[in-house]
């Protein structure tokens, strides 16, 4: 069984995406961004797909998490209990969804298949 070209880079991109969400937020994102900036242009189509998807969804997903939470806090009031209930529910739901989609992306990368993240992934087609 032959390994598709770019499979290891695709798996690395998806792994860094999950590490960014679960273990080292920010640090893993910077490593993923450097990997994208240095390897995307000459990457095989499989690797380019996973690099573009993980980097793009990390940027947009992170921006949406932060901006919506700030909007909820500003609109709901910093000292209101219900504001924090909504913030925790929103963060838990969106963060868990991003993790689940990242696991699906990792499975597809390990299988040597292309993957597009639902909703946000259309913006980052290679």
Show the residue positions of the predicted features.
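Hydrophobic alpha-helical transmembrane segments in multi-pass membrane proteins
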Residues: 9-30, 56-102
């Amino acid at each position: 069984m032959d390994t598709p070209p770019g499979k290891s880079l695709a798996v690395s991109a998806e792994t860094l995406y999950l590490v960014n969400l679960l273990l080292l937020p920010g640090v893993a994102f910077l490593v993923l961004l450097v990997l994208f900036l240095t390897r995307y242009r000459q990457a095989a189509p499989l690797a380019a797909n996973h690099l573009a998807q993980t980097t793009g969804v990390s940027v947009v997903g992170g921006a949406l998490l932060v901006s919506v939470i700030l909007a909820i806090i500003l609109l709901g009031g910093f000292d209101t209990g219900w504001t924090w209930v909504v913030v925790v529910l929103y963060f838990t739901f969106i963060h868990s969804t991003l993790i689940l989609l990242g696991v699906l992306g990792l499975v597809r990368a390990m299988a040597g298949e292309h993957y597009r993240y639902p909703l946000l992934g259309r913006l980052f087609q290679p």
